[in-house]
Amino acid sequence: MHHIELYVSDLEASRRFWGWFLKELGYKEYQKWSSGISWKKDRFYLVIVQAKEPFLEPEYHRCRVGLNHLAFHAESKLQVDQMTEKLTAKGYRVLYRDRHPFAGGDGHYAVFCEDPDRIKVELVAPSC
């Protein structure tokens, strides 16, 4: 994949989440302008852009046609555990707590959370 561009409802709130999350995974800030920002790792980059007012409604919902979630590689199970603690400490919503860290199934060690627009984000440890 080359890049993904997400339109967001609140650029600053999304910048705080994605900036922190991606930097924890080794991404570096790549581009920045008044209505957007991107982070890059290796040959892939993720872009967030402030959606214009006429396009803020209806709110995003992952069960509609389109994007369900974004999944990222973790370095280890320890990184998944550490990120779970940090997500909680920062007040972000961790999903599927009752099945964590195996909400994706047996042998699928991951944390699922939501960004400020409720886009589901997954961080997956390498499988054995």
Swiss-Prot record:
Higher taxonomy: Bacteria, Bacillati, Bacillota, Bacilli, Bacillales
InterPro entries: Fosfomycin_Res_Enzymes, Glyas_Bleomycin-R_OHBP_Dase, VOC
Name used for this protein in its record: Uncharacterized protein YqjT
PROSITE patterns for this protein: VOC
Species: Bacillus subtilis (strain 168)
SUPFAM superfamilies in UniProt: Glyoxalase/Bleomycin resistance protein/Dihydroxybiphenyl dioxygenase
Family annotation (Pfam families): Glyoxalase_4
Positions of the VOC domain: 1-126
